[in-house]
Design a protein with these regions (language model features):
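Positively charged, phosphate-engaging catalytic surfaces used for nucleic-acid and nucleotide handling
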Residues: 2-152
Length: 152
């Protein structure tokens, strides 16, 4: 009934074009959101084992593990991934409210996951904080180069 006027036809055509555009964009956006969620869950799944490894390593040395020790590990990795900033600093700089990981890009989350997984292994091998920090910085650069080469 709306189509009986010229304005009605224009409105209908507008909505048809909107639906066509949505059908073109929706699969791409859905795929991107799915990949971001996978990266976020992966990063989350490696954090707990890293913390557990840290606690075991410190216990074997006869040391207690305080909350600041976990924070130090997270800050070390975040500084590598987030250009020298802790997650808190990065969130403030980018105006992020809530959990900074929820606002990180897929690449940042994958990078963080890689570093958490590698850090867990280095902790289990008995490597100290300064040595792990240096090793992770070097491995991070290699990982980034490999990622860039793979995209070309």
């Amino acid at each position: 009934m709306v189509e009986r006027t010229e304005q009605g036809r224009l409105i209908r055509q507008y909505f048809i074009k909107c639906e066509e555009a949505l059908h073109k964009v929706a699969p791409t956006v859905t795929k991107q959101l799915r990949n971001e969620l996978k990266a976020r869950l992966k990063a989350q799944s490696y954090h707990k084992p890293m913390c557990a490894a840290l606690e075991v390593a410190r216990m074997e040395q006869g040391k207690t593990t305080l909350p600041r020790h976990y924070t130090n590990e997270s800050n070390m990795l975040n500084r590598i991934v987030l250009a020298g900033m802790t997650a808190k600093q990065w969130a403030q700089h980018h105006g992020v409210m809530g959990n900074p990981r929820d606002a990180m890009s897929e690449l940042q989350l994958e990078h963080l996951s890689y570093l958490e997984q590698t850090n867990t292994t280095l902790i289990e091998l008995g490597m100290g904080y300064p040595a792990r920090k240096d090793k992770l910085a070097g491995l991070s650069q290699k990982w980034l180069v490999q990622r860039m080469e793979a995209k070309q």
